Curated annotation (Swiss-Prot):
GO molecular function annotation: rRNA binding; structural constituent of ribosome
HAMAP family named among the record's database cross-references: Ribosomal_uS8_B
NCBIfam families cross-referenced by the UniProt entry: PRK00136.1
Listed name of the protein: Small ribosomal subunit protein uS8
PANTHER family with a match to the protein in the record: 40S RIBOSOMAL PROTEIN S15A
Lineage: Bacteria, Bacillati, Bacillota, Clostridia, Thermoanaerobacterales
Length: 132
């Protein structure tokens, strides 16, 4: 079966594993997914991730993070720009997620970054997703 939106699949797998308190989740890898996983790690939404070479495209193993009483660190994930409807934002129109409590992941000409970093560097781009 052909996958039309691999990033939405990536976010859905993380969301589903998070809802049932899985320790880790494995997804097919790509450069964009690795960049998003790196941002999630830097922002403290996941414990860690690792890339596993399998002779094809590789696998990305993501270790989810929970609080001391099994509180979910990731409350929600939402895909914004989809293959059928791309969403772009100029540098002064970058969205704030929950008044700054969440992050928006933006694909800019200088790579994939958070909305805060893109705002600081004065860059706009495609709004990939919101995470809070």
């Amino acid at each position: 079966m052909v996958m039309t939106d691999p990033i939405a699949d990536f976010l859905t797998r993380i969301r589903n594993a998070n809802m049932v308190y899985h320790e880790k989740v494995e997804v097919p890898s790509s450069k964009v997914k690795r960049a998003i996983a790196e941002i999630l790690k830097e922002e403290g939404f996941i414990k860690d991730y690792e890339y596993i070479e399998d002779g094809k495209q590789g696998i990305l193993r993501i270790f989810l993070k929970y609080g001391p009483n099994k509180e979910r660190v990731i409350s929600g994930l939402k895909r914004i720009s989809k293959p059928g409807l791309r969403v772009y934002a100029k540098k002064d129109e970058l969205p704030r997620v929950l008044g700054g409590l969440g992050i928006a992941i933006i694909s800019t000409p200088k790579g994939i970054m958070t909305d805060k970093k893109a705002r600081k560097e004065g860059l706009g781009g495609e709004v990939i997703c919101y995470i809070w």
